């Protein structure tokens, strides 16, 4: 059986930018039918960075306000949606784990990528 939702999580460093990392979570409807992603509030996604010991050092949503109303997004068959955010890694060195979270009630996703900052 094919999974209805397929995700990819990428971390890139924009050209000529030594301090910022760009996080991209691509969420694809892997079916030919329309899918509705349901969210408990206005926050659809989140990105987290943890250090080597697993301590959280950055969370995109920290300090942000989101509506309390439930919301939904519809994806047509084979359609995708992209969630993107950036993090300033200034002064950070070592091994890290980034976590991308799709906060959908009906298709929740949490995926990780490990990376090193010299």
Residue ranges and their predicted role:
Residues 11-13:
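Extracytoplasmic/periplasm-facing segments of secreted or lipoprotein envelope proteins
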């Amino acid at each position: 059986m094919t999974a209805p939702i397929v995700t990819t999580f990428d971390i890139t460093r924009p050209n000529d930018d030594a301090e910022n990392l760009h996080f991209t979570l691509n969420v694809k409807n892997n079916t030919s039918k329309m899918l509705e992603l349901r969210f408990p509030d206005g926050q659809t996604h989140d990105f987290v960075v943890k250090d080597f010991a697993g301590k959280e050092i950055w969370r995109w949503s920290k300090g942000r306000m989101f509506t309390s109303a439930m919301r939904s997004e519809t994806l047509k068959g084979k359609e995708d949606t992209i969630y993107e955010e950036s993090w300033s890694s200034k002064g950070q060195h070592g091994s890290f784990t980034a976590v991308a979270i799709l906060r959908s009630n009906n298709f929740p996703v949490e995926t990780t990528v490990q990376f090193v900052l010299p």
